[in-house]
């Protein structure tokens, strides 16, 4: 199952890899001590706030440790040549908090949430290839029938929407309140 709990021994094993012109792309489960500073810095860029990193980093570690043991959510890190470029989470739709008032998740729906800072770790084309790579991996699991990605307001809103569209997702539900996201979706090929 895509969201089976993860037990770490020393380092997470590579779940999938592929070669790009820019190098080797790998998908792994998040390894808290090694990947958390990158994820936190990406969140910091997305929020455009100057947070005190240490207390929040400790809370994020606990949160990701919880996700690792979850049966309904899982966190992954995508690396190019061993360096992280973004974190992506998969959440079982019916068990995840509703993202939009006009949408009810069904069995087989999975939400993905991507933390990528300002998309400044690689060329934008690498992000497109990387997200396609993740979707291919997620769709290997028979329980995954549809993937839904939210796009919230923010300085990178258009860039995120373009990433999803160029990866093959289609917009299907626009926000109706300021706090709701637009939703994009793709079905199992």
Task: Label every PLM stretch briefly.
Residues 43-46, 67, 167:
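Alpha-helix boundary/capping residues
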Residues 1-19, 27-31, 35-36, 82-189:
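Acyl-donor (CoA/ACP) binding surface of acyl/acetyltransferases
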Residues 55-75:
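Active-site rim helix/loop that mediates acceptor-substrate recognition in acyltransferases
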Residues 23, 74, 86:
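Short beta-strand or tight-loop elements
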Residues 33-40, 61, 65:
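An amphipathic alpha-helix signature
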Residues 41-55:
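Helix-loop element at the rim of GNAT/NAT acetyltransferase active sites that forms part
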């Amino acid at each position: 199952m895509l969201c089976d709990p993860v037990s770490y021994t020393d380092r997470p094993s590579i779940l999938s890899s592929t070669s790009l012109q820019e190098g080797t792309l790998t998908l792994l489960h998040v390894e808290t001590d090694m990947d958390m500073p990158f994820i936190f810095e990406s969140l910091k860029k997305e929020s455009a706030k100057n947070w005190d990193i240490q207390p929040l980093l400790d809370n994020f570690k606990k949160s990701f440790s919880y996700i690792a043991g979850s049966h309904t959510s899982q966190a992954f890190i995508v690396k190019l040549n061993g360096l992280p470029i973004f974190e992506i989470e998969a959440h079982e739709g019916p068990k995840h908090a509703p993202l939009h008032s006009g949408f009810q998740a069904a069995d087989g729906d999975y939400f993905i949430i991507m933390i990528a800072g300002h998309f400044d770790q690689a060329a934008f084309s690498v992000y497109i290839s990387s997200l396609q790579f993740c979707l291919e991996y997620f769709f290997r699991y028979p329980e995954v029938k549809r993937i839904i990605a939210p796009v919230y307001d923010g300085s990178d809103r258009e860039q995120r929407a373009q990433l999803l569209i160029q990866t093959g997702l289609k917009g299907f539900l626009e926000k109706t309140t300021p706090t709701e996201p637009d939703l994009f979706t793709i079905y199992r090929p």
